[in-house]
Amino acid sequence: MCMPCFTTDHQTARRCRDCCGGRGRKCFGQCLCGYD
């Protein structure tokens, strides 16, 4: 299971989405992972 990730860093956000199998969402410049 992917841990929640809140970041405005582009590189970190991309890794976050990759960790979540591409299901990470961009919300107000942040990547929210683990919530689907």
From Swiss-Prot:
Tissue expression summary: Expressed by the venom gland.
Main location: secreted
Record-annotated disulphide pairs: 2-19, 5-27, 16-31, 20-33
GO molecular function, one term: toxin activity
PROSITE patterns: SHORT_SCORPION_CHLORIDE
Subcellular localization, as worded in the UniProt entry: Secreted
Signal peptide bounds: none
Keyword terms, alphabetized: Chloride channel impairing toxin, Disulfide bond, Ion channel impairing toxin, Knottin, Secreted, Toxin, Voltage-gated chloride channel impairing toxin
Pfam families: Toxin_5
GO terms under cellular component: extracellular region
Superkingdom of origin: Eukaryota
Stated role: Toxin with unknown function in healthy organisms. On glioma cells, interacts with chloride channels (probably ClC-3/CLCN3) and MMP2 at the surface of glioma cells. This complex is then internalized via caveolae, thus inhibiting the chloride channels necessary for cell shrinkage and tumor propagation.
Misc remark: The protein sequence was deduced by comparison to other short insectotoxin sequences.
Family: Belongs to the short scorpion toxin superfamily. Chloride channel inhibitor family.
Domain notes for this protein: The presence of a 'disulfide through disulfide knot' structurally defines this protein as a knottin.
Entry protein name: Insectotoxin-I3
UniProt organism field: Mesobuthus eupeus
